[in-house]
Amino acid sequence: MDVIELNSIETYCRVFELPFTHPLVGVVECNEPEKLKPYMINWGFYALFLKDMASCTITYGKTRYDHGDKSIIAFAPGQVCAFEAIPGKDPKFVGVLFHPDFIHGTGLGRNILRYSFFAYSSNEALHLSPSEFRIIRNLIEIIGTELEMATDDHTHGIICDNIQLLFDYCVRFYDRQFSERHELNRDVLQRFENLL
């Protein structure tokens, strides 16, 4: 399996034949069939993808990443994972990519470690409701629009603030997802105890 060293956003855009606009931050969109055979990526930057449809299997080491339609997956610098396309399913996703240098010295840079969905131990995607999906999609579009505008003294701060807002919503939705699962598991345990 080929290993792709993605040390820059420019490299990502070149490998996946996507438009390149900024060396340290980008919004990407893919609606094209996967052209690569199974491959591994060594991430050199942060990446968060909003997937409309699960079109590949993702593996961290020997653990399969649990993801599906209408979900978010996230990767951090230094993480290595394998991707293999699912036949008949074309990728459909948008993503925010940013290099650690872009957030250095910002509130986001100081707080990035609190976003546990970037942790290697996190191998479960965030599964979104339709309204949550729209919120995340809108925030990614705002970041993309800001990147298309003429740069001024406010651009960097606005992009960082919107990425942080995006991540804060992800934390909120993760908390909801795991709270619901905890309640479901507690309910199953309660019914089991009642049967005894």
Over which residues does each language-model region extend?
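Generic protein-terminus/edge-of-domain signal
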Residues: 1-59, 63-66
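Amphipathic, well-ordered alpha-helical segments in soluble domains
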Residues: 47, 135-142, 162, 166-169
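A cytosolic small-molecule/anion-sensing beta-strand core signal
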Residues: 52, 69, 77
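Short beta-strand His + acidic residue motifs that chelate non-heme Fe in jelly-roll/DSBH
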Residues: 57-59, 81-88
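A hydrophobic/aromatic-rich effector-binding and dimerization subdomain
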Residues: 84-148
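Short, Lys/Arg-enriched, Trp-marked, Pro/Gly-tolerant hinge/linker segments that flank
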Residues: 127, 150-158, 170-196
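Amphipathic alpha-helix face/heptad-repeat signature
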Residues: 132, 139, 155, 159-162, ...
